[in-house]
Amino acid sequence: MDHRAFFDDVAKGKIAPCYVFEGTEEYIKRSALAALRKKLLPAGLEDMNEARLTDPDANALIAAAETLPLMADKRLVLVLESGMLSGRAKDYDEAKSAAALCEYLQHPPESACIVFYVRDKADGRKKLYAQLKKTAQIVQFNPLDEREMTRWIAKQLKGMGKKIASPTCQKLIFTAGNDLYALSGELEKLAACAGEREEILPEDIDAICVKTTAYRVYDLANTLLRGDAGQAFTLSRALIRDGEETLFLLALLQGECRRMLAVKLLRGAGMQPDAIAGKIGAPPFAVRQMYQQVARYTERQLRDMAQCCMDTEYQVKSGRMALEGALEKTMLQLLRIRLEGKA
């Protein structure tokens, strides 16, 4: 099941005897665990009715699950970093423990709710995982898509007494990224910045939000297209100073140039910005800006810019160009292509 189905079940009081929480979206995963705790554990008796075990063997896990709850219907047994689901088990015989648990979990106790909390994905080849697929609820916590993230942001801001327009929300996601832990911190900052004003504005995001590397490279590419050499080199130096690798930045810059070329071609075919965004998998907010900018450039110029980045990356990797200064040389070439309209 996905996280939405899990939250629905918990709200209705439908609690399974055993769960596996897996997937890369840690914020929602932790929220799900908090919701389960709140549903299962009486206030004031949480510590008495929860066992937290790190990579336990079968005996330790079974002992915790068999312990009766105190003034509660169920006891929560949280299993962290189980080597029987991911990684390599230590300090015990994995095969023996997995076999014992597979047998035990065919008929888990009604007085316990066992949660295997896995960072990232469980190893599907493990014997225990194969058994859990039959007897437990596997809950997948995958990254939210843009629509889900927009709803999540609106809900968080509503709790703070704020609101945000859809285009501004798209700008926020593109600027700050899709990590919900980071976004939750940015939302608190935005709410504080807005003060008594109810609506979060685009300029609030520009003023206080921490920008992702991808956004900063996008900003660098746009600055180059505007011909603002001074600002472009200021941005590139800041990226290098913050520890970003030159080859990584070249690859991102190449991606931005290729994306701008795609926008140019699709614009020429009569497509509108939102349709282009869906086709090339780019944020609508960014595509709407590119849509206006690429009108000032020929297809040849944009092709030459993308090729320039590719050539530099190849020359650096093949040892024909020194890594130091490669980004700056590429930027100078892009500025020349902008002015001359040829490579």
What is the role of each PLM region?
Residues 1-343:
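Conserved beta/loop motifs at nucleotide-recognition and modification sites
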